[in-house]
Amino acid sequence: MASETVSNHQEKALALLQADAEKILRLIKVQMDHLTMPQCPLYEEVLDTQMFGLSREVDFAVRLGLIAEEQGKAMLGELERELSALHEAFTNKQQ
């Protein structure tokens, strides 16, 4: 029974983290669709805050043993790649 509970908590933790990552990804996608200026202080503040918050959530879940460190790194890495693509797309638009 205890291992079933742990497994359930692990699944819930991963689902919650993925939901938070999806929210950030949607924000990035909206910016990509409109190619609004990523250097906008408000935009940067929101994304930085969201990314920092998610990184803390991931760290907490890893430390509790709810997700593997590799899962957390992969989740954050995907978002960082999307952010890089947004910045690159905006830079290309400016040229």
UniProtKB/Swiss-Prot annotation:
It comes from the Bacteria. InterPro entries: UPF0358, UPF0358_sf. Pfam families: DUF1507. Belongs to the UPF0358 family. This is UPF0358 protein BALH_3577. It comes from Bacillus thuringiensis (strain Al Hakam).
